[in-house]
Regions:
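Basic nucleic-acid-binding interfaces
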Residues: 1-86
Length: 86
């Protein structure tokens, strides 16, 4: 699972062979989440509320880049790093 961003102890990644709606994964020591890219719907999450808010704020800022990376992943291409939340 290629890592595309890291911030505040959170790792953002995408699988090359993932299926279903375009989405990304967020991992933290205290949990993880799976989030749709098109509407930022939380599909599944065990992240604490604070970390989830950070992830959603970051995703809103980088939604276009996430979509581009999803297309790259589907094509088996190398994913681009995305700026962390500052």
């Amino acid at each position: 699972m290629p890592t595309i961003s890291r911030f505040l102890g959170i790792v953002i990644a995408m699988f090359h062979d993932d299926h279903g709606y375009p989405h990304f994964h967020a991992r933290h020591a205290e949990g993880e989440a799976k989030i749709r890219i098109d509407n930022l719907e939380v599909i599944d999450s065990t992240l604490p509320r604070r970390q989830l808010r950070f992830v959603l704020a970051w995703a809103e800022l980088h939604q276009d880049e996430l979509s581009e990376n999803w297309q790259r992943a589907r094509a088996g291409e190398t994913l681009k790093d995305i700026e962390p939340l500052r």
